[in-house]
Curated annotation (Swiss-Prot):
The keyword Nucleotidyltransferase does not apply. ANK repeats lie at residues 70-99. InterPro entries: Ankyrin_rpt-contain_sf. SUPFAM superfamilies: Ankyrin repeat (SSF48403). It comes from Acanthamoeba polyphaga mimivirus. Keywords: ANK repeat. This is Putative ankyrin repeat protein R747.
Length: 118
């Protein structure tokens, strides 16, 4: 069974703790690259349980500062997609907000700038 198919467990009607436990069980066999790709996919698809999935992936050992392809970190990607719940979750889990993507702008500055502009 594919990893993404295992995530399609029925989560409606479960408590937050039960959702986190079920998602964690589904992701147990995934490596960091697979976990990061799943996070990227749930951001792209605006999955309603994305915060639980991000928390489960980090609880399984994925660094909140994991670098995706093309030199984007998870936080960069969430900021680029303007995904506030994932941004907050990554920051709460310890993502480096002081890393500078460009010479004079931190992640937090870019996020604030995006919010103000839109």
């Amino acid at each position: 069974m594919r990893l993404m198919d295992r995530l399609m467990v029925k989560l409606d009607g479960l408590t937050k703790q039960q959702k986190l436990e079920n998602i964690t069980k589904a992701l147990l066999s995934a490596n960091n690259k697979e976990l990061a790709n799943i996070i990227r996919n749930v951001i792209d698809n605006n999955d309603k349980d994305k915060v639980f999935i991000v928390n489960a992936a980090i609880n399984l050992g994925l660094s909140p500062d994991y670098m995706l392809m093309n030199c984007y970190y998870l936080l960069d990607y969430a900021i680029m997609k303007n995904d506030i719940p994932v941004i907050v979750t990554l920051i709460e889990k310890g993502a480096n907000i002081n890393r500078r993507k460009y010479s004079d702008c931190s992640h937090l500055h870019l996020c604030a700038q995006d919010i103000i502009m839109y």
